[in-house]
Structures are given as C-alpha cells and as structure tokens.
Amino acid sequence: MNNLFSRKAFALLALICFGFAAMQATFVGGRTDFRDESIYFVITTRFYDGDPGNNAQCWDAPASMHGDPAWRGDFKGLIEKLDYIKALGFTAIWVTPVVENASGFDYHGYHASNFSKVDHRYESEDVSFQTLINEAHKRGMKIVLDIVLNHTGNFGEENLCKQFSRDWSANQYLIDACMTPFTQKDGGKLPDDYTDLIPGMQYDSRLALMKNTDKKNHDSHNYWHHFGQFNWDDNTRWYAQIAGDCVDLNTENPATAEYLIRCYGSFIKMGVDGFRIDTGGHIPRLTFNKMFVPRFLDIAEQYKHMRGGTPFFMYTEVCARFQGSVTYRNQPCLSPYFYTWKENKEYAWNYDSTYWDTKEVYEQTSLASLDNIASCEQQYADNSHETASAMPTSANALLKGNDYHTPDVSMASGLSIIDFPLHYSFHDIASVWNTAIEGDKYYNAATYNVVYVDSHDYGPGPNDGQRFNEGTAQWAENLDFMFTFRGIPCLYYGSEIEFRKGAVIDKG
C-alpha cells in the first residue's frame, strides 16, 4: 500500500510540475527567451518506432539483442509522440545527432562518418528531418539538435578522409556487406589487404590516416589533432582522443571549422531552434569564441525567419564529474562556467586554412609551434593557475532586493552550458541548493543553464553509471526543484515514469 501511495504521489506531483510548465508555455512561435522553454531529451533511435521498415541492428550487437534492433526509433515515431511530449508540458525537444554514423555501436549518433548528410536509418519514404522540424513547429514546439564538433568516428569522414563506401541498400548489421574499404588500388588510402587484417590492425590502419600515428603525413591538411597524451584534468583534453570511437578533430584549423560550420549551418537553415554541443569541454573556449559561436549566430540571424524570428540558443557539455564546487578540480578554465564568458584579453588567431597545409604534425610536435593552438595554450597558461576568486563574477541570476534588473550580458560568450555541478548533486537537494547559491556568480548568467537530473551519459554522483534510482520521493523533490528554480529544466525521456530506473546507462 505504501508503495502504491508513493507511486501515485509521484505521478500527481509530476503532473503538477508538468502541468505548471504547460500553463506557463504559450506554445506559439513568439517565445523570445529560451528560458521560457522546458526541454524533453530523447535518443531518437530508442524512443519510438514509427517505421519498422527502417530498423537496423548495430555491427557489434550480441545475438541476444537481435529482437531489439538498436536503430529502431526514428523521425516518424518521434512525430507520432510529439503530442504526448507537448501534453507533458514540454516546449522543446533535444534530439541526438542525426548525421551519418559508422561504428560498432552508433545508434546514439556521436560517431560521425559524414557530417553533410542525415543518416538514412532515421528516415522513412514520407518522413525526413525537415518533416520533424516542421511538425514540431506546427505545434509551437522547438527542436534542439545535438551536434558534435570535437570528433568523428574512427571509420573516416566522407569529405575529410574517405575510407569506405557505404551501401545503404545492404544489410546494415553486416559490416562487410554495407562498408566497402576504399583501398589504394581504387585510389584510396587504406591498404589493399585491409579485409585480411585482424580487427586491431584494421583500426590502426584507419587511425593512421587521420592522426599520422605511423609517422607518415597522411593527414596533410591537419583536419584532425595528432596529439597523443590525454588527461581529463589538464589542457591535453582539448587536443587528444577521448575514446577509440572519438577521433579528435583539429577545431583550431579553419578548414576543419568551416566544414563543420557549413554542415551544421545547413540545419540552422532548415529551422532548428538551437544546438546542444557535445563534448564542448574538449574544445578550448577560445576556439568557440573565435570560430564557432559567432559563425553559428551569424547564420542563425540570417535564417531567423525559419524559426519564426526567435533567437537561436546554444548550450554545451563541459563534463565535470565533481561535487561540492562549480570549479572543476581547482581549474576554472576546465569548468563549465568558464565557457559562458567572452575573452578578457585579445589572443591572435590565424583564419588562413592554407597555413595548416604547410605543417607536418605528429604526436610529439610542440603545440606551442602551431598557430591558434599556441593561442589556446596561452589562454590556458593565463588561467590555469588562477583560482575561482580571480574569475569574473555576475549578479545576473540574482534579484536586487525584490526588484528585477536587466541582466548585463555584454561579456556573455553566447554559449550556455549544461549545469554539471547541479546534475552531479541531484542525489540530495541540499547539495544542489548549496552548489547553486555558492557558485552561480561565476556563470555569466546561470538562469540560462540547462538543468537535468540524469542523461544518456551519467546519473548524479556517486552512482553515476546508472539511471537515477534514489527513490520516488527524491525524484519528486528533484522535479519540484528543476521546475521552480533558476535554469532551463530538461528531462531525459522516460523519467516521467521512472523508466529503467537503476539500469546501467548505455555505453555505446
């Protein structure tokens, strides 16, 4: 009986919270401040299957999963559930990346093989990504597109380093059927005996073409970083490869940046309302401020009619699995709040992409010898020994007495963040409250922080490898806080019914 009561109480509180959000939302295109939104986050392939005909399994899926294809949900299914999401009170939907992917587990979209095209496995004959955007806008809802600037997958990138030809008509579960190596005899770079190599050597041969790991200058345009030493807790996280399926792009090379801007700019032109930028903490703030943020905002301004004239919103993931402080391990420049600010001094930046064509770069090449990266290194040196007390502060999230005041965003970078310090503290509301009260001044405007309890990556600490499972009462308290405190509330799909609580978070 107590369990039944608690579940009913949770459902009631959830309805109250979501209903409150629904009442506050006008569901018209004229919402001019993204802080009026509430976000529902879905992994599109795992949400709802609207077209069984496009279902596909991942190459590395075990036989036990064959009845549950990883690529099952699609744009058509998401459209079918837009009214459900709207009825919950959410005004915006954050969808995982939609570009073509290639890896053993690529259903999540973070292992790009072609940034310029939408992956066919999301689409149906009568439904494209444009259809999804249009259907959301018809309902007064907004689409936030997850994008990746930091890396590609490890199967090359069609327009930067073509390594395979993809046959979308073949069985996508069979890598040998759908992926034909682009070998030297055909004008490519992979070895002619590629298919005879063991998997580890195949991986090494692919990686060498992107990172010059065999001491040969394959990546002569330097589209990727070639740095090899990685540490989560220093600036090497900006240039090194964070995982085997995440090959680090040289975002400081204007040619790489311009290609990404052109590809993702096409989605702005289609009418997406904002970007969630993956792995932003693995890109220097200076690179965002010099390259990506101003360019995306320029395109968004030019095509604002596709969004009904409303501002374009961007927020990024600066992962900080750390409790008790908004400053990550005493390093302000690796902390989420750092990315919300413009630069406080001028740094040189070379916008000539041909500069990189003249450089042979290998793992041991000095970072300080490379334009733009040298400036990022200088920015790190200028801030790495500073404490939080030396950082700029803001009262933008605060009232002055009982009076509203217009926020001063003159030093805002134009990039907001996922509130990792709050996210990681949601096992205990007191911790969340104290973290915000003590740390909000370090953000340019903490009211723009996107706040969630758990996600496809992590739950709150210390059990961050599983979906939130601290009980219905704690969920209710968390929801109450998210929808009434500062910041933009975001709910990971299914949390409204405690879906998969305690389950291990997908590691694909």
Where are these regions (language model features)?
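Bacterial N-terminal signal peptides
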Residues: 11-21
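Structural recognition of the beta-strand scaffold that forms the well-ordered cores
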Residues: 38-43, 92-97, 114-117, 142-146, ...
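Short, acidic/polar
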Residues: 72-84, 253-269, 475-479
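The substrate-binding groove and active-site-proximal loops of carbohydrate-active enzymes
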Residues: 62-76, 111-124, 242-257, 273-283, ...
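Active-site-proximal helices and loops of the catalytic beta/alpha 8
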Residues: 133, 137, 151, 262-269, ...
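N-terminal structural segment of carbohydrate-active enzymes
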Residues: 25-145, 150-161, 167-172, 176-177, ...
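Active-site region of glycoside hydrolase catalytic domains
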Residues: 36, 153-251, 351-412, 442-444, ...
